[in-house]
């Protein structure tokens, strides 16, 4: 993490300084023109291992009808419309108790047939990962077969728990999950949400997360120029950016103010658990 620079008084603007930076809003619009990165032309999945001879084991959802959970759909629609922290918390709670469908698509291989004809060998299957314009990797997941078919009618649904889907996404070096990509309620599930699902723990907004608040308090402790501090949500809903407001003693130079914020940011950067719970970090400095 790096700190934002600020002079004395209230900083003119926040500067995000999270371990993943600012990840964008909860809408999946940035992935609308995605490109697939889930497999290569040789029929390998994104881990580089052939799917030949592999079987999908029983998931515990053999009687699943593929219908989306109405409560989950409503929660996703609320976040897509107004991504407040409360709405996001409701969505993650609904998602944790539901199931998702992960798409499996044909990983075609170009083969040359007799007489020089070219055809696609689509015997291999793979789970796609997508790459957004900003370079983020994402695993698409869906609430039901209707949303999946809207995205890709040829994709096969594999039901699984959100925890298992999140663990698979992390194993594939994905940064986010995309919920119901292609729908009007599509939502990007940010890294903090991805890790919460994978670890099967409740997700909390960073500025309300006890672990994060304790970590910030420890990072600020021992800074004699800091009179008090608070943690609050950033200015842009749906980004997951947390703002740390530092109230410093009067009379500090610009360089001294920046040094304080830098030291605090560097301490926070060493806390791996905090990094998994905070999507972005900004500082605002005031004087007492």
What residue spans do the PLM features occupy?
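An interfacial alpha-helical scaffold signature
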Residues: 1-288
């Amino acid at each position: 993490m790096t700190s934002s620079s600020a002079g004395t008084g209230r900083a003119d603007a926040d500067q995000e300084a999270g371990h993943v930076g600012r990840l964008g809003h909860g809408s999946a619009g940035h992935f609308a023109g995605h490109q697939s990165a889930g497999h290569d032309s040789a029929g390998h999945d994104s881990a580089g291992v052939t799917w030949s001879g592999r079987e999908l084991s029983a998931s515990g959802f053999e009687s699943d009808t593929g219908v989306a959970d109405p409560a989950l759909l409503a929660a996703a629609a609320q976040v897509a419309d107004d991504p407040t922290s409360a709405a996001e918390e409701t969505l993650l709670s609904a998602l944790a108790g539901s199931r998702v469908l992960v798409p499996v698509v044909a990983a075609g291989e170009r083969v040359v047939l007799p007489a020089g004809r070219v055809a696609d060998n689509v015997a291999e299957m793979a789970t796609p990962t997508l790459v957004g314009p900003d370079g983020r990797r994402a695993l698409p997941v869906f609430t039901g077969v209707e949303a999946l078919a809207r995205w890709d009618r040829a994709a096969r649904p594999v039901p699984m728990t959100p925890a298992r889907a999140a663990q698979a996404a992390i194993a594939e070096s994905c940064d986010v999950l995309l919920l119901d990509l292609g729908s009007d309620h599509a939502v990007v599930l940010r890294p903090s949400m991805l890790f919460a699902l994978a670890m099967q723990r409740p997700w909390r907004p960073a500025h309300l997360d006890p672990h994060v608040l304790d970590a910030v308090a420890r990072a600020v402790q021992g800074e004699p120029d800091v009179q008090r501090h608070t943690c609050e949500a950033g200015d842009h809903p749906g980004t997951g950016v947390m703002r740390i407001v530092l109230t410093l003693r009067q009379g500090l130079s610009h360089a001294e103010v920046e040094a304080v914020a830098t030291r605090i940011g560097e301490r926070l950067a060493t806390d791996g658990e905090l990094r998994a719970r905070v999507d972005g970090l900004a500082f605002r400095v005031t004087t007492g």
